[in-house]
């Protein structure tokens, strides 16, 4: 190679060194100094892995002093290049810059610059980059983006609500599904969509203290959303890092009590500029016109400041119209400002609901009924629709569906309230109760007696709680020497049940973690029963491992022993046997226990076993739950209301279980209350609201589309290719499980989302649902999204050279494969990717500018090519540099037409969609006041900004491949 002192070269193997300068040479070697790092390299002159850096007219270069020059001419003087051009900061022309004075920190970012500088990538990285562009663009365009990545069953009614609400601007809704229908999952899906699309970035979740960990686990395990849990300690700690501690995290969970207890803390919460607020158990927010509770006022303050609000409640409005109004008032105080007016409005919706029921029944409509429909939808000419709906024509059903849809839009709260009931959703198992009455051991009798004497001053409530757990009373007196499990008949019964059902998985729930730990030891030591333990003292990872061991079919644990708090947020649908070693204090917790197994998707009827000790609070409670509320074998939406009204009497019976006088009357009274409330609920069921919330056929199709996407083999092939190239080890463990671990030769030292000790992944939804230790990989999983960002945000694979062995073409024929990206820059919240995601346009040009891309498919072509090592590649590039420049110019002239077509289509689509949405809502505003002014204004503003951003869209060269034909 001809070297001259002062020339600038770049290392082919260590491009991070920057620009090198020739500082010494002899007959056989040359020395380069790399000023940006201060390092020297000695190379052999004859075959050194370095490439001469030469810029061309039209390029912009930077001097070592920092000013830039636009090159007009390149001269050569004594083997050194001199660049002549216009200085950009002073606009001075005919400025010269000798190559020795170039900035040494020069980074080649354009694909063509990297190619000419010898920074040539491996061929497989170029292919990965193109696939990443192609798949990313396709994923952005998916109509159900944000709904596929969660570790959940594809349940239509949940998907329907999430799809509807998740795409709105700053959604403000009340999710009021019955227990077990998955409100938490619906809220998670909405959050996931809003965060993924950029519509929201900061989220605050406020829940009762006992549910904090459940939400933390659900958000992480199901949606890969890592929330920070704020309590007093975390708040104090964060005060050292920021004036407002809540600004130290983007995603926060805290308890309602934590939020309202301290005035300054509440102010900090209100000032933290959240995009979305989620409030669980919103029925605990007590409100009346005269005296709203402190909790209610705290949430009201937040709801006034946060644009998006999701309230979750399981209590139907029929059990308290005033509290129902209060929750709607939090969502839209302008719309729901007068309780009396609200009650009157609700009565007026009856005819709408009747009309829908009439249409759904499918019977011929009378003239009166047709007239009533005409009156209800009076502002539009629906005569043709009415005629079609009442005919025997093929389009009769479609006409009825459209009329139902029109009526839905007019329904008072259909945009702010969603409620599904078990009656309207299919797929739930039966629940069968098996009670086992056992004698009270003398040791417990003595302990209870002594406790009664010593605790005479205790409140009835405290005594009742003690009496529920006699083993705890006994242990308190006996201390560490107490071995209650040696005589407690429940332990003997449990061992007998487990040994006679060895092939079945059994979930055992008890109130305390200590009870679970002691039972595990007894089962293991006495009967050799494999039992996993699950309690609040364990980390999330430890609980995952326990859950995974329980889930394993052949070698896994037969039984999982859970404490009350430890089991929150976990579902074990693969098991159908539940043992309640003791009973919880209220019906909500009882339903939560059964809900661990009683979910949509449970394949078997649930067997609920309750071994209880006679003459204890357990015997009182088992009767009250079963005979008074029917809470074991059916969900009990009335449970909390009856529990609150019967609380004082019930506590007395629990505190003194031997006093049974009047208990039968209490049970009878509660049963009558339960039946009356249940009938009231059934009668007041809002069929229209249920139809709207359920989604019908549309929701079924959505679930089916996502299921088909689950079978996409492109994802598996791409992910494995990505892991290979990034340098992540893959170990196939069978059963559709793969273990990923970091290697020593990764593209980046720490791959975002991959733990240091690795992780287990699966591409199968069913496997992910039964194996909580396995991460469910979809296009929306952080591992894949981070991988796409890693490849596409840098220059990995942006320039390469390949050989094409093809005797039909002359040796040395040049082809250049160009990948342009058409894109628009805009704030993330505009969600521009719906219309114009970064879209790759591939060209395959010969030296005459003929584009062969349409005739030569990428993957087929890629398989015909072979790689070239970097050193040989650099020589090839230098030999054909002028030809490549000419082909690049031809590419620049051709891309404009394709790019303009893409941009024009995106503009048309955006205008049609956003204008159509705005027009529809403006028309509905006349008949449904629940459409907020700020929502209409936001859609209009969004439309204008989107169209303006699309006007500014452009294109750039993202990657190129030089192909040289050979016959060898």
UniProtKB/Swiss-Prot annotation:
Protein family per UniProt: Belongs to the SNF2/RAD54 helicase family. RapA subfamily.
PANTHER family: DNA ANNEALING HELICASE AND ENDONUCLEASE ZRANB3 FAMILY MEMBER, SWI_SNF-RELATED MATRIX-ASSOCIATED ACTIN-DEPENDENT REGULATOR OF CHROMATIN SUBFAMILY A-LIKE PROTEIN 1
Task performed by this protein: Transcription regulator that activates transcription by stimulating RNA polymerase (RNAP) recycling in case of stress conditions such as supercoiled DNA or high salt concentrations. Probably acts by releasing the RNAP, when it is trapped or immobilized on tightly supercoiled DNA. Does not activate transcription on linear DNA. Probably not involved in DNA repair.
This protein's name: RNA polymerase-associated protein RapA
Organism of this sequence: Salmonella typhimurium (strain LT2 / SGSC1412 / ATCC 700720)
Residue span, Helicase ATP-binding domain: 164-334
Pfam families given in the database record: Helicase_C, RapA_C, SNF2-rel_dom, Tudor_1_RapA, Tudor_RapA
Transmembrane region(s): none
Ranges spanned by the short sequence motif DEAH box, renumbered to the chain: 280-283
Enzyme class: hydrolase
InterPro entries: Helicase_ATP-bd, Helicase_C-like, Helicase_RapA, P-loop_NTPase, RapA_C, SNF2-like_sf, SNF2/RAD54-like_C, SNF2_N
Record GO biological process: positive regulation of transcription by RNA polymerase II
UniProt KW Transcription regulation keyword: yes
